[in-house]
């Protein structure tokens, strides 16, 4: 039997609206989802006050055919502050759903269904105003577009989650609300 494969052209959708990126985390012991802040944080920002901040990114109109071959995929983020503390560890995963909406609140963010595929990111130092790419997330994107219900033009959510960073170790990136031209970008080839 023959399996059809779909060739990919390079696409680069950016987060295109205020409600499509945000940070989720614990603040003073309670959950918080902030979608209108200018800064996206990954890590443990303030000792004893904020833990496990993660970034949630929703890319709309992702024009990848169902079942397409994914050669390379990354996310480009723009540094908002210069952060060079060592030890930031993050895990990147996707939302295992067809055309997902951005979560309405912290509880909905915590309930998102993870892809089986993940990518580890030992995040290097970030310089304000400079772009940084994640490691390859090809297997994550491939798992999403291989879903039976996936269709070209749907939305895709990717999450960059703090994975045990020490207190005071974090990275700051621009959100759509900070400057739309600096919004996170999904790169797929």
Regions found by a protein language model. Give the residues of each.
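A short beta-strand element within beta-rich, extracytoplasmic domains
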Residues: 59, 69-81, 186
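Extracellular fibronectin type III
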Residues: 1-6
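Beta-strand-rich interaction/scaffold domains
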Residues: 79-152
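Flexible, small-residue-rich N-terminal segments that precede or flank a structured functional core
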Residues: 7-63, 96-102, 107, 111-122, ...
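Ser/Thr/Pro-rich, low-complexity mucin-like regions
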Residues: 143-180, 189
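Extracellular/periplasmic catalytic domains that process cell-envelope and extracellular macromolecules
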Residues: 50-51, 69, 83-85, 149-153, ...
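Low-complexity, serine/threonine/proline/glycine-rich extracellular segments that form mucin-like
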Residues: 63-72, 86
């Amino acid at each position: 039997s023959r399996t059809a494969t779909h060739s990919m052209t390079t696409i680069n959708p950016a987060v295109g609206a205020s409600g499509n990126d945000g940070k989720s985390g614990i603040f003073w012991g309670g959950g918080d989802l902030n979608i209108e802040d200018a800064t996206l944080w990954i890590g443990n920002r303030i000792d004893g006050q904020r833990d496990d901040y993660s970034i949630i990114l929703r890319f709309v109109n992702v024009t990848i055919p169902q079942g397409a071959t994914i050669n390379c995929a990354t996310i480009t983020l723009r540094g908002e502050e210069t952060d060079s503390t060592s030890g930031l560890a993050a895990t990147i995963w996707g939302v295992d759903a067809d055309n997902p909406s951005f979560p309405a609140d912290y509880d909905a963010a915590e309930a998102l269904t993870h892809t089986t595929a993940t990518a580890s990111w030992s995040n290097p130092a970030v310089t304000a105003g400079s772009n940084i790419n994640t490691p390859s997330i090809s297997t994550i994107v491939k798992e999403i577009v291989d879903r039976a219900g996936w269709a070209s033009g749907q939305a895709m959510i990717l999450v960059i989650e703090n994975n045990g960073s020490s207190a005071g170790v974090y990275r700051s990136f621009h959100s759509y609300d900070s400057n739309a031209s600096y919004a996170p970008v999904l790169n797929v080839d």
